[in-house]
Amino acid sequence: MIASLDLARFPLGIAEREALALRRAGRRSDAAFARLLLPMRLRSMPWPVPRLTLAYYFALWPDEAALGRFRGGPLARWDDARERLSLTLRPVRGFGSWGGADPLGGERSEGGAGPVALITHSRTRARDLPRFLVADGPVVRALEDAPGRLWSDGFVDDPARLDSGTLSLWRDTTAATAFAYAPGVHQSAVKAQRDGGWFSESWFARFAVEASAGSWRGVPFIL
């Protein structure tokens, strides 16, 4: 199994059209799991305050051939975007569920020495939303200042259900795990969530970045 994360920046008014077209095409693809992610500013999470010029697409594929067919077919329409970044990812490990199951199906692999991607997803219980918002602010600020963070952003999967998550790229596994597991505001928020049961489901996954093409925010992402 391999994974893909594709980011695109479009002129205002174009991103929604392109994203919806890709969602329809994705339903007919060989992807084992695919989500069109609605980019949201992390500081607004989980409220659906959209970033109207961006579109993100995350998927899991049985092999590189299946991913290649999708990127050479339906995803090629994103080639006209103002900016694009395509990442090919290898699942390292995942915990929890997204949509009722672990998208990785328990698959694991050894981490590498290069950049890594972290993806989180959660569905917040409405009654616990105020507590989540109070705890989330310091975590977002800590993430933005974390050593080794290359990029991060938020997304909403289903605004009506308060489904939200984060995407982040890191220099290496050491930097990513230091933020995720070291004592501090993030671990305090994780403990508070677990003790309070704020989420009806949540998922965390780490991926090794195997290949990249393009740039983001004007900076090439080079392995």
Residue ranges and their predicted role:
Residues M1-A55, P62-G72, W78-S164, T174-A182, ...:
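Short S/T/G/P-rich N-terminal loop/turn motif that feeds into the first structured element of a domain
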Residues A178-F179, V185-S200:
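Extended hydrophobic/aromatic segments used for targeting, binding, or gating
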